[in-house]
Amino acid sequence: MTASTLKTLSAQLAAKEVSAVELARHYLARIEARADLNAFIHVDPEATLAQAQAADARLAAGDAGPLAGIPIAHKDVFVTRGWRATAGSKMLDSYVSPFDATVVERLAAAGMVTLGKTNMDEFAMGSSNENSHFGPVKNPWDVARVPGGSSGGSAAAVAADLAPAATGTDTGGSIRQPASFSGITGIKPTYGRVSRYGMIAFASSLDQGGPMARTAEDCALLLSAMAGFDARDSTSLEPGRGGDAEDFGRLLGRPLEGADAARPLAGLRIGLPQEYFGAGLADDVRTAVRAALAELETLGATLVDISLPKTELSIPTYYVIAPAEASSNLSRFDGVRYGHRAAAYRDLADMYRKTRAEGFGWEVKRRILVGTYVLSHGYYDAYYLQAQKIRRIIAQDFQNAFGQCDVIMGPVAPTVAWKLGEKTDDPLQMYLADIFTLSTSLAGLPGMSVPAGFGANGLPVGLQIIGNYFEEARMLQIAHAFQQATDWHTRRPAA
């Protein structure tokens, strides 16, 4: 079962070579054996095995799809009925959700079995998974290093074979960057493709859920179950406008139109932003990404130099808009209705102050303060409105680029995973780690990370694929063709 893809597990379950209960027990044992990674915040073996038994009953009755009986881990930003939902924060340490997030609900309806809730940066604010109230997650490739964030627990769980797949969320790179650092595949779909209902909010105009797994084929299978219109989410794309049910794996294994099996990507124009290959890119990452691009040329693709001139403005733009939205979203955590409440206080105002001072970590407090500042009278026009204008310009830069190419590719991050504690005292250096992923999120475009080799100290490097709106199926087709020609996605860290 170790390092099995979802396709393999599905076939084994259908052939009765293994049961859902046996699979669940196997992965629960793996989670216990690798507790040192701190990838999970909460597991409930009794609940997991009950779900597995129900999946076995569906399989026996012939009432099951391709995901039935397969275990999955959920990032602890998705509320799950009867399970804790902490968002990695002391503020929600004891919160147990009375309902399922739409993502959880849809995957459960497909028959998937919840293994547990994965660790994450508090309220998804971070790039290293060191900001969790429950302690840092460790990278399975080197436990002295970060796995990336904020979906670091999900990435580490899949990389270390603690789960065959996991859910994640991406606000500024939080699926793609940990997927790159941990050597797995992950995709952030077009904004609005996947419902945010039941996903604890960070920045509502940026947050987007997506799958993390071993292969593009696995991600396509998961995204097909996760995506689609949801009336409970006001930002969900409507049917006819990107919200229709879709088989995201329908193009896998097929050459592009006009191409053939020998050169399946013939005719594909890959845009390479000059801003993604500048002086800030580490040599080892550059070498791995260039080698991956050379492989894509062998498959028939053509490389085209392009420019995304406002890339350098993505960090200041993001760190105005995202904190502004966070300061509003997190105002609900006040100790009154649910979550942490200070034990001793003089009056209501004192209770608010002490509850939030005790319940939030330093990075969350920093972003709340920044967000409150940029929304305050006298600064709203100077900062927030200007950031929104630049956001529209960044989105237009991408549309201009897509006039010259079909997809855009480059590194996911400037470096491989850094050591635990290396950047915690320098927030700016931490923020710079997201320079290649933020602009995609600001534009609402789909982006993914695909394993593309190794850099310094044998650490994984991811290749970023950015598509135009609603082109996830083509991105997955390209990623699958690359993975059929390479074996980077099959490499695993030592047990």
Curated annotation (Swiss-Prot):
Pfam family name, one: Amidase
Gene3D superfamilies found in the cross-reference section: Amidase signature (AS) domain (3.90.1300.10)
GO terms for cellular component: glutamyl-tRNA(Gln) amidotransferase complex
One Gene Ontology term from the biological process aspect of the record: translation
Keyword Transmembrane helix: no
UniProt cross-references to SUPFAM superfamilies, sorted A to Z: Amidase signature (AS) enzymes
Residues at the catalytic site: K75, S150, S174
Keywords: ATP-binding, Ligase, Nucleotide-binding, Protein biosynthesis
Reactions accelerated catalytically: L-glutamyl-tRNA(Gln) + L-glutamine + ATP + H2O = L-glutaminyl-tRNA(Gln) + L-glutamate + ADP + phosphate + H(+)
EC numbers, comma separated: 6.3.5.7
One Gene Ontology molecular-function label: glutaminyl-tRNA synthase (glutamine-hydrolyzing) activity
InterPro entries: Amidase (IPR000120), Amidase_CS (IPR020556), Amidase_dom (IPR023631), AS_sf (IPR036928), GatA (IPR004412)
Enzyme class: ligase
Function: Allows the formation of correctly charged Gln-tRNA(Gln) through the transamidation of misacylated Glu-tRNA(Gln) in organisms which lack glutaminyl-tRNA synthetase. The reaction takes place in the presence of glutamine and ATP through an activated gamma-phospho-Glu-tRNA(Gln).
Family statement drawn from the similarity comment of this UniProt entry: Belongs to the amidase family. GatA subfamily.
Oligomer status and interactors: Heterotrimer of A, B and C subunits.
Protein name in the entry: Glutamyl-tRNA(Gln) amidotransferase subunit A
Organism: Ralstonia nicotianae (strain ATCC BAA-1114 / GMI1000) (Ralstonia solanacearum)
Gene (name only): gatA
